[in-house]
Amino acid sequence: MATRMGTGVGKGEASWECGREAAQAALAEIGPAARPDLVIVFASPRYDHEAVLKGIRSVTGQAPLIGCSSAGEFTERGVSSQSVVVAALSSDAMRFAVGCGRGLRQNLSRAVEDAVSGFRGASPESLKAGLVNRTILLFADGLGGGGEALIDELMVRTALQYELAGGAAGDDAKFQKTPVFYLDDVLTDAFVCAEILSTTPLGLGISHGWSPIGPTMRVTRSEGLVVKQINGRPALDIYREFARQQGVTLEGDAVVPFLMEHIIGWIYQEGDQKLRVTLWPLEDGSIVCASEVPEGALIRLMKATDRSVIETSGRASRLALERLQSAPLAGMIALECVSQRLRVGEAGVAQQLQQIQDVVGPTPLAGCHGYGQLARTRGTFTGLMSASALVCAFPRA
C-alpha cells in the first residue's frame, strides 16, 4: 500500500485557468492512472475564488476538496506570491472524509457537530482495517477569532481521539476577507476539515523562534481580538513604557513596527507561551491582535531575530519527521504565519523553504502563509499559535 502526493502552481490573471493549471500539474505528479482522494488548495485573494475552484474541479472532478485564502504560497519548486497552489493526495493506505462547519460565530457547537458528522475514525470498519491513527487537517476563517474555542470543541466532539493540524486563512495582510474552501463553495464565518485515517502516524511539528523578555504581566481587560488593558493600564501605555526602556519613543509610524517586533506570549503552561501577533493600536490605547488573548491571561512580551524566525521552519520539519517514526515520506503541508513573511521578506521566506528542504530533501511540499496555526499534537501543544511554523508530514505507506 502507498500514498502519493503531487503539487502544482497556477499564476496569471485568469482565475479559472490558474486553478486548472495548478490542478493539472498536481495530478500529473501522482500519475495518470491515480485518482485524487484529497485535494488541498491555497489561493491568493487576488483571484475570484469561485472561478479558481471551478477550474480545479474541472480536473479533479468530485474528489474531496478543502483549502483557504492565503497570504503567500509556496511549493517544493519555490516561493510564489499571488498564486494558486494545489496539492493532490492519492492513497490506498489512508481513508479521507471532509466536512464543513458554517456559522461559527452564531453556534460553534453546531458548526463542529456538522463538520465531523461524517467522520468514521471509531467505526468497526476503520478499526478492522488497522486505521488506528486519526488526524484532522483544518482551515478556518482567519478573521473570525475563536481559534482556541474551535480546537476545544473539536476535541470534545471527537472524544480526544484525533490529532489536529491546520491554519487560519489569510488575505495578503489586508485583513478584510479570509474565506475557506469546501468542495465547490467559498465560505466565510466557517471552517473546513479533512479526516485522515492511517495505519502509520502522520508527522506533526510546530515551532517558533521567539523568546520572552521583561516581566510577567496580566491582561486585565480584553474583548475578542482587542487587548484593552495590561496590569490595569491601557495596553499601549505598557508598550510605550517598555519602549522607553529600550531607548525608543513610541509615536506615529514607529508604533506598528515595534508592536510587530514585540508580540505577546500568553503563558499557557510553565515555560511555554502561545504567541499572539500585536497588529495596531486603537485611539483608546487598546491593541488589536491577530488572535484572541483571554482576559486574566498571564503574558510576557516576546522578541525574535530574523535568523531565529527563519530557522523555525526547519525545526518544525525535524519534529514532524521524528513523529513519522522513520516511515518513508510521501509529502508535506507547511503552514506559516504572515507575520514571519512581513518580517523577513521574500528573501527570508526563500530561506525558510530551504530550511525545510534541507531537512526533508526533494519531497512534494505545498504551503501558505496565513493568520495563525491550529494544532493538537500529543504531548506537545494544543490550541492556536501565531508567528509559528506548523508542518504536517504524510507517510508513504
Where are these regions (language model features)?
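Small-residue-enriched flexible segments
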Residues: M1-L38, F42-P64, C68-T363, C368-A397
